[in-house]
Amino acid sequence: MSYFRNRDIDIERNSMNRSVQERKCRYSIRKLSVGAVSMIVGAVVFGTSPVLAQEGASEQPLANETQLSGESSTLTDTEKSQPSSETELSGNKQEQERKDKQEEKIPRDYYARDLENVETVIEKEDVETNASNGQRVDLSSELDKLKKLENATVHMEFKPDAKAPAFYNLFSVSSATKKDEYFTMAVYNNTATLEGRGSDGKQFYNNYNDAPLKVKPGQWNSVTFTVEKPTAELPKGRVRLYVNGVLSRTSLRSGNFIKDMPDVTHVQIGATKRANNTVWGSNLQIRNLTVYNRALTPEEVQKRSQLFKRSDLEKKLPEGAALTEKTDIFESGRNGKPNKDGIKSYRIPALLKTDKGTLIAGADERRLHSSDWGDIGMVIRRSEDNGKTWGDRVTITNLRDNPKASDPSIGSPVNIDMVLVQDPETKRIFSIYDMFPEGKGIFGMSSQKEEAYKKIDGKTYQILYREGEKGAYTIRENGTVYTPDGKATDYRVVVDPVKPAYSDKGDLYKGNQLLGNIYFTTNKTSPFRIAKDSYLWMSYSDDDGKTWSAPQDITPMVKADWMKFLGVGPGTGIVLRNGPHKGRILIPVYTTNNVSHLNGSQSSRIIYSDDHGKTWHAGEAVNDNRQVDGQKIHSSTMNNRRAQNTESTVVQLNNGDVKLFMRGLTGDLQVATSKDGGVTWEKDIKRYPQVKDVYVQMSAIHTMHEGKEYIILSNAGGPKRENGMVHLARVEENGELTWLKHNPIQKGEFAYNSLQELGNGEYGILYEHTEKGQNAYTLSFRKFNWDFLSKDLISPTEAKVKRTREMGKGVIGLEFDSEVLVNKAPTLQLANGKTARFMTQYDTKTLLFTVDSEDMGQKVTGLAEGAIESMHNLPVSVAGTKLSNGMNGSEAAVHEVPEYTGPLGTSGEEPAPTVEKPEYTGPLGTSGEEPAPTVEKPEYTGPLGTAGEEAAPTVEKPEFTGGVNGTEPAVHEIAEYKGSDSLVTLTTKEDYTYKAPLAQQALPETGNKESDLLASLGLTAFFLGLFTLGKKREQ
């Protein structure tokens, strides 16, 4: 019998008034028998929304456990006085309603807990370790449950003191007789760590004391441990440790857990009993401890920990500072589909201001995908009004596709990575870029070196290879093909192309018959092809970028025989403005050798021209004859992963020095100095730890302000390719750099970029960014001024409501301007004396409340009860918030929850939101066979305060005696892969950093993510979840 049929019978028999019925609709979730849709219909029919109370601890306190004074109170609607009409209910019905309401309570973090096919073994909420309980919460009565687990997850949400001990335990199992038999999840020097030891005292797992991810002292954190028993795929089992939802380290050494510790007797939070000693105590606030009966996946851990993900606080501009809104100059497609012009992706920005004041924005136009191969055109757009408006795209070159390619996704010769520069004397603008024959570019080069050029009678000619022959044919004057013995043939190569985008360059003719193209490599109809090598091409413009010359091959001028790869450091080159080499054009490039290629030989250098671009020369590499770890290296022979430097950006100081800012693998900024215009380099590379390098291209320019000399540098602030930063350095008299400011310029994804000075104290930046489903990447442009660079941004002093949004009938979302967390359910006090009650937390910034329809439009005066905490420890303010749609109640709603008529799941026609996997990409860890640096941890011997009547816990860090995890390879990005799979990694299964997807419901991009997706999901899924949770509790 359906819920609503029962409801009608009750109305007829008892003549209950509407208020009683509304309460039944609110609280009788467990009585639903026809599913969530019935409940939704009921809410619509009766004009009500279920009121959801704050969940208390999911288990009753242990019988032998002292109730702690620090426990948070549980706030429910039972605390309100009841209407007089409800006194007519019988005692049985009152008792039943009380039970119903108790079962209906849902977690304050319902969305984070909504996991499938998993059972809770132990759960403890809202406790503390402090002086009153000896810094320890005893859970020993749960030991038998733990011993039965073969696969498990231990998830803990906690807040340590800002000045916590060097080492403290979170959750542990230990023995009353054997001090070295235990399991502990702990924190060591703010690093989340882990240890398990058997009855013989031997370690189960690898070393976690130098794992990369740290907890935030004095703030809320989550640490999650998973263990999996041995299987065919995991012969020894696996353990993983996560911090705030992100995987910190994996160990495949053992899948042992509590069942493998026969003598353990104690289970505890905080101070740990090890035989006769109590150790590792600290003051902790524990929001939640949950043990599950299986290992959660990385995706599930991210979801369970979603409320603990936080970003840096958004700062405001100081007086006088200007940062324009971004303008998308080259806009990609969305959701994997091409844009209106058939282009899926744009990459590799290059920005140049010409002598006429025109801005030229250059890019890779990647038609099929964002990878570093396939159909890529070199394109530009021009602005003659300082970036306000932009002209149509102009294609410098785009070689034609192979119509019979074996793989169409890579079936084109490749042009990639552009550098723009203008000669101030001739006014000629140069575009220099890489070229590869059909294939995967730098990732598809031949393992065996093929000669690309042959010198004959003092002239250099390009070599052609003919199928089935070993001799070297050559392309000579007018494109005529010559045999290996120097005889002209009937074959002719197009060397002076005339078709649009010069797409016919490389076409091969026999007489007037087109046979194919010498740049094709698969299923080719041409009998010839060029060497599978890398090349450097140049185009130029003599009319301010409006039209461009056909590509010219400058490779033989600058590429030595030993170089496997030679490519540009994309962005903008410079012309030396003073010194003995004044007028010299400098273009950043980097090379690899045939010994170690991308794994150990990438080296930055300069190519230069002293005759206005007619001829080009290669300078020495920064790595040539440099001392590294006591050994002299050279770019032609080196095999040293850590010593590599790759794409770079170049500036000249007023004293004539040339500074090369290089992308590298040290995690910080590396700068080389040349005293001779970029031909040779000082042997010491200066490192600046104030500027992070997350192994991505950067851009730098030289500028003057009020007679003083400065460098402006822009790059991704990390932890991966995200959070664009502009850095300001003062140039000292000796040429050294003093870094003054580091200001954020773009939140979210941020990769390659290019800077230019625009004049009048204004600067421009063209950069890679994506949002709102854009493919990687869209190239966006912004302008900023000197005050933005040189002044500190203003930090927020409180967390406040940014906007409110009506999510459905009787439900409103409050979105804050920074991350918040609910521990004690807040009730909003309204100006009319009524209240709005807390439902649950939707994401890191959004809280859901129920409000009566007649109270919509009311202002919030404060909290009637409960609390909202800032994840950044700021005061939280709700006063003045208006309960209506829009920016803090002042802006009309853009989205409203539609009536749900489709199947359960996502609403409307929108696809489920795409989730992105976060990852840790910091400096720890290595690739290949090289061990990660071993970090030795000194034993802590300092004092600890006494807790209560118990002696102060002894600080004893877990002793690690097994194989150091530092000897195991971890993820490390080596070669730059600019496509959709943007990281090139060398990994082993033993230790790596997983990219787990964002579990929280993403908010649409408007600087911060807003609550539009709430609307698209609707309350349907929410109420369905509540029903499911209620049924689980009933069962």
Swiss-Prot record:
Keywords: Cell wall, Glycosidase, Hydrolase, Peptidoglycan-anchor, Repeat, Secreted, Signal. Substrate binds at residues 347, 663. Residues 1-53 form the signal peptide. Its EC number is 3.2.1.18. It catalyses: Hydrolysis of alpha-(2->3)-, alpha-(2->6)-, alpha-(2->8)- glycosidic linkages of terminal sialic acid residues in oligosaccharides, glycoproteins, glycolipids, colominic acid and synthetic substrates. The modification Pentaglycyl murein peptidoglycan amidated threonine is found at residue 1006. InterPro entries: ConA-like_dom_sf (IPR013320), Glyco_hydro_33_N (IPR004124), Laminin_G (IPR001791), LPXTG_anchor (IPR019931), NanA_rpt (IPR049964), Sialidase (IPR011040), Sialidase_fam (IPR026856), Sialidase_sf (IPR036278). GO terms for cellular component: cytoplasm; extracellular region; intracellular membrane-bounded organelle; membrane. GO terms for molecular function: exo-alpha-sialidase activity. Gene3D superfamilies: 2.120.10.10, 2.60.120.200, Intramolecular Trans-sialidase, Domain 3. It is found in: Secreted, Cell wall. BNR repeats lie at residues 381-392, 539-550, 607-618, 672-683. It comes from the Bacteria. It is an enzyme of class 3 (hydrolase). Residues 94-112 have a biased composition (Basic and acidic residues). Residues 61-92 have a biased composition (Polar residues). Its main location: secreted. PROSITE patterns: GRAM_POS_ANCHORING (PS50847). Residues 57-112, 902-951 are annotated as: Disordered. The active site is at 372 (proton acceptor), 647. It is a peptidoglycan-anchor. A motif (LPXTG sorting signal) lies at residues 1003-1007. Residues 1007-1035 form a propeptide. GO terms for biological process: ganglioside catabolic process; oligosaccharide catabolic process. Belongs to the glycosyl hydrolase 33 family. This is Sialidase A. It comes from Streptococcus pneumoniae.
